[in-house]
């Protein structure tokens, strides 16, 4: 699992807009924005969250930590 802050930070690292992430993940822009506004772990279905994670990892993002212990992101 990842947090909403990790999604925002990952987008910032690779300089993607919410629209770009949505298009590349094949989800709606509203879905990305809703996930990023959540507190902690986004409350979306697991499949949608998995699409976001895989898209960001394919773009070179590595998710580190856990939602409860120093969550972060870095470039691979």
What residue ranges belong to the model's regions?
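DNA major-groove recognition helix of helix-turn-helix/homeodomain DNA-binding modules
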Residues: 46-63
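Accessory recognition modules or surfaces
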Residues: 17, 22, 28, 72-76
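Recognition helix of helix-turn-helix/homeodomain-like DNA-binding domains
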Residues: 27-44
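A detector for short, charged/polar N-terminal pre-domain segments
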Residues: 1-2
